[in-house]
Each structure stands twice: as C-alpha cells, then as structure tokens.
C-alpha cells in the first residue's frame, strides 16, 4: 500500500511539473496565444463579408482606418483596391452567398492579431445561369 501511494504521489508531481513547463513554453512562444470568435474584429469581418454579399462594399469602409492595408494572398491592398476587386465579382455572378462560415481572431503572444474567415462561396453565373459552389 505504501508503494502504491508513493507511485501515485510521484506521478502526481511529474504531471504538475509537466503542466507548468507547458504553460511557460506557451507564454514564451510567439506563435501561441488565444483564439476568439466573439470579439470586435470578428464582428467587423462579418460586417465586411455581409457588405460584399450585398454588393455594398462602400458601406464597410467605416470599419477601417484610412490607411488600412489588406493582405490578400501575399498582396498588400488598400480599401479602394479591395472594394473594386470584390465588387467586380458581382459583374459576373448573381446571388453571391457565404454559407457554413466560421470567423475567429487570433491574438498572438508577440502582439500580432489576425482575423480569419472560412466559408463556402456560392453564386449563380450570369453567363450560364448555373450555380457554382466553392
């Protein structure tokens, strides 16, 4: 019985030490942090994508500062460039929708903040009248 208690106590001590070590690593790792889905940045992303779907991108301009820089697939773009790019999709498609979407903002330990948005894109081609899902 004494050996069983000794083994249990030893395991308990090692498990506590491992947990603390993990927390120390997470705090010092710049690629660690917290991810949330209900914050002002995630809400702004939802407002932005709603404006895109409604083809009313100019209504989303107030979300951003005048010097905003969008990083779209390694390309830096201004709001006006993003507005023109996203709006041009409506020249070729009707009924653009985002379904099955998830949004979250990652607050990294090094102070960087990124908001991510995953979705299924659907629209109807103006040329073929076929619905497309991506």
Label each region the model flagged.
Residues 6-8:
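Sec-dependent N-terminal signal peptides
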Residues 50-53, 57, 65-69, 87-95:
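Sec-exported extracytoplasmic/periplasmic mature domains
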Residues 87-133:
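Surface-exposed, charged secondary-structure patches
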Residues 17-57, 62:
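Short, low-complexity N-terminal intrinsically disordered segments enriched in polar/charged residues
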């Amino acid at each position: 019985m004494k050996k069983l208690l000794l083994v249990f106590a030893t395991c308990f001590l090692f498990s506590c030490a491992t947990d603390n070590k993990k927390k120390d690593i997470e705090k010092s790792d710049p690629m660690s942090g917290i991810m949330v889905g209900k914050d002002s940045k995630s809400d702004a992303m939802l407002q932005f994508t709603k404006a895109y779907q409604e083809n009313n991108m100019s209504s989303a301009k107030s979300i951003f500062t005048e010097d905003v820089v969008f990083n779209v697939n390694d390309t830096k773009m201004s709001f006006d460039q993003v507005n023109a790019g996203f709006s041009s999709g409506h020249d070729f498609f009707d009924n653009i929708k985002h379904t099955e979407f998830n949004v979250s903002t990652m607050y990294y330990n090094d102070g960087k903040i990124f908001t991510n948005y995953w979705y299924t894109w659907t629209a109807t081609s103006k040329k073929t009248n076929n619905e497309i899902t991506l």
